Curated annotation (Swiss-Prot):
Pfam families the record matches: Chorismate_synt (PF01264)
Source species of the chain: Bacillus pumilus (strain SAFR-032)
EC number: 4.2.3.5
Enzyme class at the top of the EC tree: lyase
Pathway: Metabolic intermediate biosynthesis; chorismate biosynthesis; chorismate from D-erythrose 4-phosphate and phosphoenolpyruvate: step 7/7
PROSITE patterns with a match to the protein in the record: CHORISMATE_SYNTHASE_1, CHORISMATE_SYNTHASE_2, CHORISMATE_SYNTHASE_3
Chain positions recorded as FMN binding sites: R132, S133, S134, N253, A254, G298, K313, P314, I315, P316, T317, R339
Name listed for the protein in its UniProt record: Chorismate synthase
Cofactor: FMNH2
Cofactor note: Reduced FMN (FMNH(2)).
């Protein structure tokens, strides 16, 4: 499977075309819109989320609630477009109109794509860069992830994301009873944190950063349960499941690090403290005593829960901006200010959940794939049976 996205932050709409989704999958627009609504929530979000009410429209690939096997086209309209029709319109304008155009940007923000993108593509108005590099694009990535989650749900695979840390405040209590329990509690938290006490401190940290015109980042975790053994490959580097998951998480705006299981802690431990001992269970077959490697060995799933974490840096748009340079005058200036969040970590956990779900679904369809969802399910069940009987 694959998908492409198109659209600018303040353009008329965002679009994604999804190819390779098997036929016969039951899906409704409400399933997608539920995920889009989750992305818009979260303490620390900016005024843009008060303007947008993201709703996906399915234009192709689905008939009477079931996928056809043909490409699925989804669009999400930008409500804010009506305020940007002249600035972001596709029609040509004169040089005089361009010189008088408001909202042109010549002072790049440190930490953003502004300057590098302007040099790469030759844009004197860096709005041409920031409109596409904006995290607004993740709206349709979440929509694509919603389709992937429906595939996984049909196969008995569950995906849940939550927040572990914001602005140095760490969740102390993360021992959830089940993945359903984790989902229920985090959906009720304004910062998507399972630990309610830590969640309140996270909100306080966000409020303090906002008051100071600053921003803060954090750490999110995504858990995948119900995986069959052997998804991925040890044969080639580009087919390793952990490689694909790491790339997906790092492709999210502002994400700068990724780890699996105990992650970077493994560097300071002995091998006996890192690797998961193999045991035989009458019901499950081969399994592990622990899950320190996060459900992945040799580029493949072990059948244990996959645990992946991503580090999100603070958003680079600051209301007390850092020093920059005006590219027209070469004089020092404060960086440009755009409407932005003070913290997007809670929303980013939903995006991380979506991209992980996509990579898992893609790997499963590739490995067990046929063109019909029920046949894929039969093959997945055969692998689960093999794990029990091998």
């Amino acid at each position: 499977m694959r998908y492409l996205t198109a659209g600018e932050s303040h353009g008329p709409q965002l679009t994604t075309i999804i190819e390779g989704v098997p036929a016969g999958l039951y899906i409704e627009q409400d399933d997608i819109n539920y995920e889009l609504a989750r992305r818009q929530k979260g303490h620390g979000r900016g005024r843009r989320m008060q303007i947008e009410k993201d709703q996906a429209k399915v234009l192709s690939g689905v008939r009477h609630g079931k996928t056809l096997g043909s490409p699925i086209a989804l669009v999400v309209e930008n409500n804010d477009w009506k305020h940007w029709t002249k600035v972001m319109g596709a029609e040509p304008i004169t040089e005089e109109e361009e010189s008088e155009m408001k909202r042109q940007i010549s002072r790049p923000r440190p930490g953003h794509a502004d300057l590098n993108g302007a040099i790469k593509y030759g844009h004197r108005d860096m709005r041409n860069v920031l409109e596409r590099s904006s995290a607004r694009e993740t709206t349709v990535r979440v929509a694509a992830g919603a389709v992937a989650k429906q595939i996984l749900a049909h196969l008995g695979i569950k995906v849940a994301g939550h927040v572990l840390e914001i602005g140095g405040v760490k969740a102390a209590h993360t021992a959830y009873e089940s993945i359903e329990d984790l989902q229920k509690v985090t959906e009720e938290s304004p910062v998507r944190c399972y630990d309610s006490e830590a969640g309140q401190k996270m909100m306080d940290a966000i409020d303090e950063a906002k008051k100071n015109g600053d921003s803060i980042g954090g750490i999110v975790e995504v858990i995948v349960e119900g995986m069959p053994v052997g998804v991925g490959s040890y044969v080639h580097y580009d087919r390793k499941l952990d490689s694909k998951l790491a790339g997906a998480v790092l492709s999210i705006n502002a994400f700068k690090g990724v780890e699996f299981g105990i992650g970077f802690e493994a560097a300071s431990k002995n091998g006996s403290e890192v690797h998961d001992e193999i045991i035989w269970d009458e019901e499950k077959g081969y399994t592990r005593k622990t899950n320190r490697l996060g459900g992945l060995e040799g580029g493949m799933s072990t059948g244990m829960p996959i645990v992946v974490r991503g580090v999100m840096k603070p958003i680079p748009t600051l209301y007390k901006p850092l020093q920059s340079v005006d590219i027209e005058t070469k004089e020092p200036f404060s960086a440009s200010i755009e409407r932005s969040d003070s913290c997007a970590v809670p929303a980013a956990s939903v995006v991380a959940e979506a991209v992980v779900a996509w990579e898992i679904a893609n790997a499963v369809v590739e490995q067990f794939g046929l063109d019909q969802i029920d046949r894929i399910k039969e093959n997945v069940e055969k692998m689960r049976q093999l794990q029990r009987e091998f």
